[in-house]
Curated annotation (Swiss-Prot):
It comes from the Bacteria. Homodimer. Interacts with FtsZ. GO terms for cellular component: cytoplasm. It comes from Prochlorococcus marinus (strain MIT 9211). Belongs to the SepF family. This is Cell division protein SepF. InterPro entries: Cell_div_SepF (IPR023052), Cell_div_SepF/SepF-rel (IPR007561), SepF-like_sf (IPR038594).
Length: 192
């Protein structure tokens, strides 16, 4: 059969091109109907998993809250690190990735290495959407995103030897209105 004849047959809708599918006609309608009556016979193994949720930790209750895999419900951990060199900083990043809070005491390090260490861990903390807080002199707290950090310290009161005044006298106000004298000397009066 030539190509032109086949095209004519397709356009005209001749049935002789459908002869390849005639072997399906050998099945009787009764066999198809019998198969449709029992659909469980043809279901896959995935249907048995449709009723179970592997992430459900509620124990069969009707709660809409599901657990996240990989996150333990154990108590939170805090790692206190006193590194002596920058080479120990990847341990702090790994602890943050494991959702542990890290407190770095950098008093044992040189100041330039300590600055580098803080920058490195702060970058890692930022990458995981964590929080950082300066706790004291060369002591820093880094927490993952699952930990909320709040600062409950209030501003320290002024020492007793420092007095603050809120009212200004008229002399002080009048002095502040005049222009200050230049630091290089008194201005010379210009001749008119």
């Amino acid at each position: 059969m030539s190509l032109i004849q086949r095209l004519r047959a397709v356009v005209a809708g001749d049935d002789y091109l459908d002869s390849d599918f005639d072997e399906l006609d050998d099945y009787s309608r009764d066999e198809f109907d019998a198969g449709n009556r029992n659909p469980r016979e043809y279901t896959s193994g995935l249907a048995s998993f449709s009723g179970s949720n592997p992430f459900d930790v509620s124990g069969g209750s009707s709660s809409n809250v599901i657990g996240m895999p990989g996150i333990s419900t154990a108590t939170a951990e805090v790692n206190l690190m006193e590194p002596r060199s920058f080479d120990e900083m990847p341990k702090a990043i790994q602890a943050l990735r494991e959702r542990k809070t890290v407190i770095l005491n950098l008093t044992m390090m040189e100041p330039d290495q300590a600055q580098r260490a803080v920058d490195f861990v702060a970058g890692g903390t930022f990458a995981i959407d964590g929080h950082q807080e300066r706790v004291g002199e060369s002591i820093f707290l880094f927490a993952p995103s699952c930990v909320s950090v709040t600062n409950s310290f209030q501003e320290e009161p002024a020492p007793s030897n420092v007095t603050t005044t809120t009212q200004q006298s008229e002399e002080t106000i009048s002095e502040s209105v005049t222009a200050p004298e230049p630091a290089w000397g008194t201005p010379v009066a210009s001749a008119i």
